[in-house]
Structures are given as C-alpha cells and as structure tokens.
Amino acid sequence: MKKVSNTTNVEYFDYKGLLDPLMANADQTKKNVILLTTGSFNPIHRMHLEILNIAYKHLLSSKEYNILCAFISPSADCYVKYKQPPLIPFELRCDMIQNAIGNFYQENKDKNGEKLKIYLNKWEGSHPYFIDFPDVIFEIQKQLDKLYGNITLLYVCGMDHYIKCAHGLGQNVIAIDRKPFKQGFGHDNLMEDHDRMIFLIRDDKSEPYSSTSIRDYYKKGDFENIKKSTFPDVFNMIIEFYDQNKNSFVKNFNYK
C-alpha cells in the first residue's frame, strides 16, 4: 500500500476515546472486529446502514466475534464530483450520515437484542485528493494495530463491488448480495473462507435502494420514493439541497 497522507487518522478520529471502553467490556475469548464501509454517500440511503446491520447480525450469530462498532467513511469531494451530479459537499454529506445514524437508532430502539454502534470516520474525505478503499482500510488498520494489536477491520460492501474490486483484497471482507441476485456469483461460485475472514451473505429481504435512484426520483418529482429510500431527517436535507441546486439537474438530467 502506498503512503497516502502525512496526517494520521487520530487527527480526525479519537480511536482510544471510542474504543477503550468497548475493549474493556469485550469478551477476550473472542476475536475483536470493527466493520468498515466506504463510498460517496451522495446521498446516504437506508441500504448503506442496512448492509452494516446484516453483516453485524451474521457475525453475531456465530458467537465467535466481538463486533465492537462500525465505521462509515465518505469519499472526498474531488472524487464524488466526477460521479453523477449534483455533488453534495463533504460536510453536508457528513451531517446527513450523522442524522441517518440517529434515525437508524430511533427506529431500532424498541427491538430486543444487541445494537450495532455506528460512527462517522471523516479521515478519508477530509483530504483534498481521492484515497481508494484499499488505502483507507490499510490506514485505519494501521492505527488499530498501533493502539491495540488485536482488532481486525472487516470491509463491508455489496456483491457488485466485491466482484469488481474487493475480491482482490484476499481477506477480511463481508460481501452482501442483494436482489436481483448476481447470476453465477453465489456461495458456490465465490469462495467463502472463515479462516481468512471472507463472508458472502445473500440478503433477500432488503429493498434495492441506491443514491442514483434517489436522484432519479427527485428528477421525476417522486418524493414518496425518496422518503422510502432514506431516513426522515435526511429526506428533508436532500430536498432542501436539491431544490437549491436545480440547475445541476437541468444541465445534467434535463430536469423538468
């Protein structure tokens, strides 16, 4: 892995303040893991958090792991602006992520069982240049090794991303296959290896939400499906931002 920054993760994220209490209460007979997902989150939708929850429940059921928490790492503006516009600025995307996490907790507060702790990690997106996900994984794992030495970072992604990119990591990956399932890429075709901590999970319950569909819904004036796709507080932020940036839709989507 290349060196991507002269700054450290610690300048953007208080690992010890967060993890010391979690490690103190962890069952030391189990493997300590932290989940990580990366992406544009332009904007964040329900599936971004749901894949973390699916991964969490899958690991929890094995009773072999302490799932300490999960990190969400949004990409820098310099990368996101070259994807489908309009670009939601980094700090606003971070605010949306925080609100999504808060709404996610509210919606699940009455459910029995343990809850996954989810935190925004701003290190990646705070840079003026793009940092690819393998380097994000490497840098965060390096900080965890330096501070603790016994925490494994597990990268959580969709099956599309796993097939295209993350399969090359070779270890420490949880891939979620959503409807419509990838033909020919099930558990029988891609090797699941618990020794190398590669987990392939088929999810047949979640809706196929996406950031692209949210932008398309706005273009069509379909606010009801935007509400279904994301969280209440995020919905209001999305509509306000898109209303203020309709020119981007006119230029790029022939907005009507």
Question: Residue locations for each model-derived region?
Answer:
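Nucleotidyltransferase catalytic core that binds NTPs
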Residues: 1-256
